[in-house]
Amino acid sequence: MNLTDTVATILAILALTAGTGVFVAAEFSLTALDRSTVEANARGGTSRDRFIQRAHHRLSFQLSGAQLGISITTLATGYLTEPLVAELPHPGLVAVGMSDRVADGLITFFALVIVTSLSMVFGELVPKYLAVARPLRTARSVVAGQVLFSLLLTPAIRLTNGAANWIVRRLGIEPAEELRSARTPQELVSLVRSSARSGALDDATAWLMRRSLQFGALTAEELMTPRSKIVALQTDDTIADLVAAAAASGFSRFPVVEGDLDATVGIVHVKQVFEVPPGDRAHTLLTTVAEPVAVVPSTLDGDAVMAQVRASALQTAMVVDEYGGTAGMVTLEDLIEEIVGDVRDEHDDATPDVVAAGNGWRVSGLLRIDEVASATGYRAPDGPYETIGGLVLRELGHIPVAGETVELTALDQDGLPDDSMRWLATVIQMDGRRIDLLELIKMGGHADPGSGRGR
């Protein structure tokens, strides 16, 4: 091989490496682009953007074309490298006593390492990183060439696609021609968290979006006000009794029951007081103004609960358990607070549900386990309970009195028991048989000998 042939071969290898880079860049830029971004740019962009749109609509075909192009250019690079390596001189190695066979092998090895490394770096890694970092800009530069190549080799691409699809079907899997663009709520939550960490979303927006996306995974049982916290009025109560109950409790909505909450006949709102003249309020029964009550099962998901509550007359629904008994009541305010946080008015208790206290937190016993995790970092194991108060009751095994403590098992980020971290719960206040307030303290390792279960 003369000098001219050697130079031509080297230039051809460089050109093939660049071709590999074009196909790699096209593949990664097309997969990195979101469909909504592609469509938006195509509507108001240049002809290149519309070219990208057409390629994105046939993404599976274009990716197969890119793979075929990468294979062809890589094989051609290897084919041209072999004679070039064979012509490399090795008299220096022979002069130091190395045999021709060993010298040929050594030179071939190092030459292939150099060529392969250059091809990998400049033909694959650099284009890939550029495409991932700047997908739209990269696609505008390379997709036209990629589409033209795929058009010219359409028969070969369809043949290889058909063979691959046949094999995949034999494995019991139906091939997907395009990448899935829809995302589940869990995937969207992960994207929101990543965007917040990178600074693309501010913390407040990310927090609101996460809670909105996670809302549908909650159930009516998790969203409701529990039965023990409901103030009910009887069917023989009057409008005057409604006024007194609203003043005493600070609530605005009350179920009207016949005996107990399992026999709820309607819902009244304090605003209905103004529909009755003052002189008639003492003898006007609540049943005359009560609205029909909506009923939802405790297992209904948050989105469905929202729809039913919004459709009800007073934006309130009673929640029933699997046995048909009333488990609680859910209002539109409950649902909104689950998304935006506490919405307090002049009638609400000013005490927040979680308060930092010394080296721990004072939390309401009615807080759900996931709310405790968000506020304090304590991750509880799964169990037959919904609230932190329920967890403590289960661990104690009896109805406690104020001052009792119990050591709680914690989970790590992978959901496995974390023996290196323990938490101590102390009952601060009881409300009848319900834990109203408790204190959580994070402790390294096991609790000290002075603490224990049910002390």
Swiss-Prot record:
Entry keyword set: CBS domain, Cell membrane, Membrane, Repeat, Transmembrane, Transmembrane helix
Organism per entry: Mycobacterium tuberculosis (strain ATCC 25618 / H37Rv)
Protein name: UPF0053 protein Rv1842c
Residue span, CBS domain: 224-285, 286-346
Topology within the bilayer: Multi-pass membrane protein
Subcellular localization, as worded in the UniProt entry: Cell membrane
Principal subcellular localization: membrane
Family matches, as CDD domains: CBS_pair_CorC_HlyC_assoc (cd04590)
